[in-house]
């Protein structure tokens, strides 16, 4: 680009001296329109005009440039510059659009998959095979719009969750209940069995002690040798009865003797 600009600057004084003013004005206008960004420092035209050699005779020297060559070169350079400037403009606009798209995308990042996570973490409940009820939870999902600003729009989508479960899961819950009841019964049995064993041991020990006491009481020397098992108190009571009967008979005999007399 710099080389083209330098060549154009060297060609400007010769163009001013030529008769093709209309072409120069058109080329200058196109150059002014297209060159927007690059800043060009143009030297003084007077010093350039002094250095340029203008022919006076009909023969063109080697260092001079004709009008046709100037026209062709200026048109080619003008078209080249316009194409370059248009390419630069296109790239700059594309870059700005990309920046805007990225900023919009970062702004519209919404944390909305909470509904999805709750749906995945939620467990179904009980079921009857005849009817299954469903509840609707409005979840919002991010969907990009086709507009050039690329801003995201939120649309609500109803999501259904089954409240009831299959019969196999119900059977599984019943099996869990049975397992819990069996565990509790095992704990009770582990407590009851030692108590029952202790009671049996106590009753056996009581029977053994009673048997030993009776054996010792039979071997007591106060009992008679003829093998009577009655205790002394019983014998005393028998003696008292015999004494009473004897006294009663003697009283009757005395009463009969008195009546006879």
UniProtKB/Swiss-Prot annotation:
Q: Hey, what's the signal peptide range on this chain?
A: 1-18
The record's listing under InterPro entries reads: Endomucin (IPR010740)
Q: What Pfam families does the record tag this protein with?
A: Endomucin (PF07010)
Mind telling me how this protein is modified after translation? Highly O-glycosylated. Sialic acid-rich glycoprotein.
Extracellular face residues: 19-190
Kindly state which keywords UniProt assigns to this record, in alphabetical order.
Answer: Cell membrane, Glycoprotein, Membrane, Phosphoprotein, Secreted, Signal, Transmembrane, Transmembrane helix
Per the record, what is one GO cellular component?
Answer: extracellular region
Q: Where is the composition biased (Polar residues)?
A: 118-134, 146-171
Ranges annotated as spanning the membrane: 191-211
Q: Which residues are glycosylated?
A: 19, 28, 98, 104, 164, 178
* Region (Disordered) location: 118-183
- Give the organism the record lists: Homo sapiens (Human)
The segments annotated as topological domain Cytoplasmic are: 212-261
Q: GO biological process annotations for this chain's record?
A: hematopoietic stem cell homeostasis
Indicate whether Membrane appears among the record's keywords: yes
Q: What does this protein do?
A: Endothelial sialomucin, also called endomucin or mucin-like sialoglycoprotein, which interferes with the assembly of focal adhesion complexes and inhibits interaction between cells and the extracellular matrix.
Where in the body, by tissue, does this protein show up?
Answer: Expressed in heart, kidney and lung.
Record PTM Phosphoserine, positions in chain: 237
Quote the protein name from its UniProt record.
Endomucin
Disulfide partners: none
């Amino acid at each position: 680009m710099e080389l083209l600009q330098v060549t154009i600057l060297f060609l400007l004084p010769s163009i001013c001296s030529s008769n093709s003013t209309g072409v120069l004005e058109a080329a200058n206008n196109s150059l002014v329109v297209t060159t927007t960004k690059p800043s060009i420092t143009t030297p003084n035209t007077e010093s350039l005009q002094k250095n340029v050699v203008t022919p006076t005779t009909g023969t063109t020297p080697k260092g001079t440039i004709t009008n046709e060559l100037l026209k062709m070169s200026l048109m080619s350079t003008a078209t080249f510059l316009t194409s370059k400037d248009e390419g630069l403009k296109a790239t700059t606009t594309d870059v700005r659009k990309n920046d805007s798209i990225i900023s919009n995308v970062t702004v519209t990042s919404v944390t909305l998959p909470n509904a999805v996570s709750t749906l995945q973490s939620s467990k179904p409940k009980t079921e009857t095979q005849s009817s299954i009820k469903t509840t609707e939870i409005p979840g919002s999902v991010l969907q990009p719009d086709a507009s050039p600003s690329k801003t995201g729009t939120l649309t609500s989508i109803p999501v259904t969750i089954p409240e009831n479960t299959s019969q196999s899961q119900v059977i599984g819950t019943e099996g869990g209940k049975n397992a819990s009841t069996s565990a509790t019964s095992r704990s009770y049995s582990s407590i009851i069995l030692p108590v029952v064993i202790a009671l049996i041991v106590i009753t056996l020990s009581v029977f053994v002690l009673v048997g030993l006491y009776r054996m010792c009481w039979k071997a007591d020397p106060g009992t008679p040798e003829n093998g009577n098992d009655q205790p002394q108190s019983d014998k005393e009571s028998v003696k008292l009865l015999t004494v009473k009967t004897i006294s009663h008979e003697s009283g009757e005999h005395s009463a009969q003797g008195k009546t006879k007399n």
